[in-house]
């Protein structure tokens, strides 16, 4: 991993880190640096695996094209094997979609329907204005308060 860095250079970096960061912060700094290095390694490995997988798929595709051009009768065993692998991969990709299509064709959920605003308003004819009129009585708003004179009370006026 440390190509070109010898033991003496690593020792010098460690001593400088100890002097600059101190004994309390050096372990935390080392842990964070090693965490970054691990994350970069994981990312590089995942990219490498994805590229290898894509190259394998491209190779299978090229083998299939080669087999089509030669004709399927006189193929080498390698090409027959790669054709079988490609067919199996295509079937495994199609299986989840076939299961999903067959289950969704049998039943249609009524909850998934979209209603127009007219349909919704016909089911619930009460408007917010009507409900507020039912909750408050008009007599409560028209009656003056009896027995309390608020004109002489300064706190009630303002």
Curated annotation (Swiss-Prot):
Disulfide bonds: none annotated. It comes from the Bacteria. GO terms for cellular component: TAT protein transport complex. The keyword Protein transport applies. Residues 86-158 are annotated as: Disordered. GO terms for molecular function: protein transmembrane transporter activity. It is found in: Cell inner membrane. Keywords: Cell inner membrane, Cell membrane, Membrane, Protein transport, Translocation, Transmembrane, Transmembrane helix, Transport. GO terms for biological process: protein transport by the Tat complex. Residues 88-107, 113-136, 143-158 have a biased composition (Polar residues). InterPro entries: TatA/B/E (IPR003369), TatB (IPR018448). The chain crosses the membrane at residues 2-22. It is a single-pass membrane protein. The Tat system comprises two distinct complexes: a TatABC complex, containing multiple copies of TatA, TatB and TatC subunits, and a separate TatA complex, containing only TatA subunits. Substrates initially bind to the TatABC complex, which probably triggers association of the separate TatA complex to form the active translocon. PANTHER family: SEC-INDEPENDENT PROTEIN TRANSLOCASE PROTEIN TATA, CHLOROPLASTIC. Belongs to the TatB family. NCBIfam families: tatB. Part of the twin-arginine translocation (Tat) system that transports large folded proteins containing a characteristic twin-arginine motif in their signal peptide across membranes. Together with TatC, TatB is part of a receptor directly interacting with Tat signal peptides. TatB may form an oligomeric binding site that transiently accommodates folded Tat precursor proteins before their translocation. This is Sec-independent protein translocase protein TatB. The gene is tatB.
